[in-house]
Amino acid sequence: MPRLWYSRYLAAARLRCRPLLIPEQPAVRLYQPLRRTVNTDANVHRPNEFVPLRKQLKEEAKRAKSQSRNGRGKKQVAANDGWELTVGIEIHAQLNSEAKLFSKAPTSTVAEPNTNVALFDLAFPGSQPEFQAATLLPALRAAIALNCDIQHTSRFDRKHYFYQDQPAGYQITQYYEPFARNGFIELHDYDGIAPEDGKSVRVDIKQIQLEQDTAKSHEHPPSAHFLDFNRVSHPLIEIITMPQIHSPATAAACVKKIQAILQATSAVTTGMELGGLRADVNVSVRRRDAPPGAGEYYGVQGLGQRTEIKNLSSFKAVEDAIIAERDRQIRVLESGGTVEVETRGWSIGSTETRKLRSKEGEVDYRYMPDPDLKPLVIDDGLVSALKDTLPALPDQLLSMLIGSSYGLSLEDAKPLVELDDGARLEYYQDVVDALLALRHGEDGDTANKLLGRAAANWVLHELGALHTKSDVTWHADRISAQTLAELIDQLLRKKITSSVAKQVLAMIFEGDQRPIHQLLEEENLLLRPLSRDEYIALANSLIEENPQMVAQIREKNQLGKIGWFVGQMMRLGEKGRVEAQRAEEIVRKLILGGQ
């Protein structure tokens, strides 16, 4: 069975160019998605039940929000009729590097403020930028994974502006000659794209460029701002998509998919949820039945006038901000107004974007080549080595999980890939490997699928439920993969029942250190199967006591009530001796006969 995990990148050892001293990169981890739960039950509060005031207010707020959302959705559908939305995205991601881009100071997100600072980071007179070669590796991995053409030669430019977080008065970037061009990303229906986009949609990537981050500002009311220069010159990549997206949901799915790819390749530090990635979106609208608009950017003509929304920090913010700006522009145009060229902002929970400033153009930033930095020359051997060692990407992982080796459904495969920054998938793989070792005599696709599905059920649902109930984050050491595999093996060999397996799992989760076999023996939990006559006697006693329910099953075909009889048999029978499947067979035979 193929391994899905790559723990280290050792590309430097395979280079045909001059060796670089590159710090060892951490293990690949996929991201943990943000999850949204919408309460659709209109009858949450029941007058006959006591509900604490705090809970009642919370539930009423949920209902009001849901109703507002539903109403807004209908309004949007009506307002959007006859209009075409176009969106382009710019994603800024902090690279996973121990070195800064242009100084020898280390990077850190937890160090004391202003402790990881070099003279160049503070723009001391006479200090010079020193490009750190190690920062290039995560950037190249990201560009390769996003199907970009790596440029043999690229150059750095200065982007001039004056603000407190940039002491030099300019940012070093790659505006004119970036290191990667002409990439693309494929989005599928399971990524969450809009239904009108069909099964899949391709979004082209114009370029990916290296650039330096700015200082971090800490506001201290009423009027002070503290600056932490640890973040200055932290290496960033800016990923610029073409304006080819036409729905808010697909735009959010695009950002989410790009983040997943960046984290799968260990190219970035963290995702949006921890501030390691942020997005700007360019939004424009035009009437579908009108002549092409005068707007143009990145070579795409006929667009409406665009605005840019800056610093969106979640997938939901991307979607909601685009919806709000689309509707605002439509209202402006329908009232006879003109959409202004400007930069706008968005706050979580808002219903409208807000103007920040008139949008700067190329002339405003006064881009010019940086005279202190040589051209960046990337050897083909380095690119080839990184391609050869690139780990499996999210789509590839999904294909392997739902393929013949594991046989999972898409509904189970996606959470394994997405949850817990990739730790759940790694743990699942360890459980499957341990199961294969325990059942080494069984081989073939059928056995693999059986073990793969069983492991997924227990890793995702049973063990996942215990973490959720205890309100703790996922931790693989809570129950070792070997221990869970042994428990599943006992269940598959019918040495214990499913209810006993869940009981044992909970005991170990709460700290029981006994080995599985010892725990089962000492707690007298091993299955001692009932005979057929014992099953029949137990079922008959329940059938005789519940003639009305039997009639409903026979006459009204209410087969779901068979499960009630099974549950009662497991409750009334001696602990650990009643198997649900066997009990259901007996109940069906006695009530339905030959049916």
UniProtKB/Swiss-Prot annotation:
It is found in: Mitochondrion. It comes from the Eukaryota. The keyword Ligase applies. One of its GO terms (biological process) is mitochondrial translation. Pfam families: GatB_N, GatB_Yqey. It catalyses: L-glutamyl-tRNA(Gln) + L-glutamine + ATP + H2O = L-glutaminyl-tRNA(Gln) + L-glutamate + ADP + phosphate + H(+). Keywords: ATP-binding, Ligase, Mitochondrion, Nucleotide-binding, Protein biosynthesis, Transit peptide. InterPro entries: Asn/Gln-tRNA_amidoTrfase_suB/E, Asn/Gln-tRNA_Trfase_suB/E_cat, Asn/Gln_amidotransferase, Asn/Gln_tRNA_amidoTrase-B-like, GatB, GatB_Yqey_C_2, Gln-tRNA_amidoTrfase_suB_CS, Gln_synth/guanido_kin_cat_dom. GO terms for cellular component: glutamyl-tRNA(Gln) amidotransferase complex; mitochondrion. Its main location: mitochondrion. Its EC number is 6.3.5.-. Gene3D superfamilies: 1.10.10.410. GO terms for molecular function: ATP binding; glutaminyl-tRNA synthase (glutamine-hydrolyzing) activity. The keyword Nucleotide-binding applies. Residues 1-72 form a transit peptide. Subunit of the heterotrimeric GatCAB amidotransferase (AdT) complex, composed of A, B and C subunits. Belongs to the GatB/GatE family. GatB subfamily. Allows the formation of correctly charged Gln-tRNA(Gln) through the transamidation of misacylated Glu-tRNA(Gln) in the mitochondria. The reaction takes place in the presence of glutamine and ATP through an activated gamma-phospho-Glu-tRNA(Gln). NCBIfam families: gatB, PRK05477.1-2. This is Glutamyl-tRNA(Gln) amidotransferase subunit B, mitochondrial. The lineage of its organism: Eukaryota, Fungi, Dikarya, Ascomycota, Pezizomycotina.
